[in-house]
């Protein structure tokens, strides 16, 4: 009984102190300037982009199911944060493949992803410094359901030539489209 009274007596004399730790609502940006949290550039996005290989021009992209795993890194949420819309509801296996040094005013990123089990799309995305998508262009395509359709591209400084192939008939059909990448990061069909 004495023990119980002792603990009760000690409890009544103990003061509980809580220290409030202020929340940090500002962070330091790349240039050392303090920026508000709502405008913060995510460091992990910058780190992720820094990991991507930089490919020099000219580039031939013929990404297929056979070679998609050989370059780049899996997306860990970057595409969602920049509000990338793949154009199909069942898109999976997003992979950031490489960057292209078109301009210092925006970043050019090549992304591959599957639509369903049988289609693989590769898209060139231009993103401004605030991580907003400027434009996008599909530069490669592979499908394994019929293995009859494909797309590949040749990327140069002044133009992007995309060649689509259709092997459904005895004679294959090849069609080319040429695009220019404007100084503002938009693609223009030539």
Language-model features, listed with the residues they occupy:
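Terminal domain-start segments
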Residues: 12-95
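Sec-dependent signal peptide recognition
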Residues: 1-2
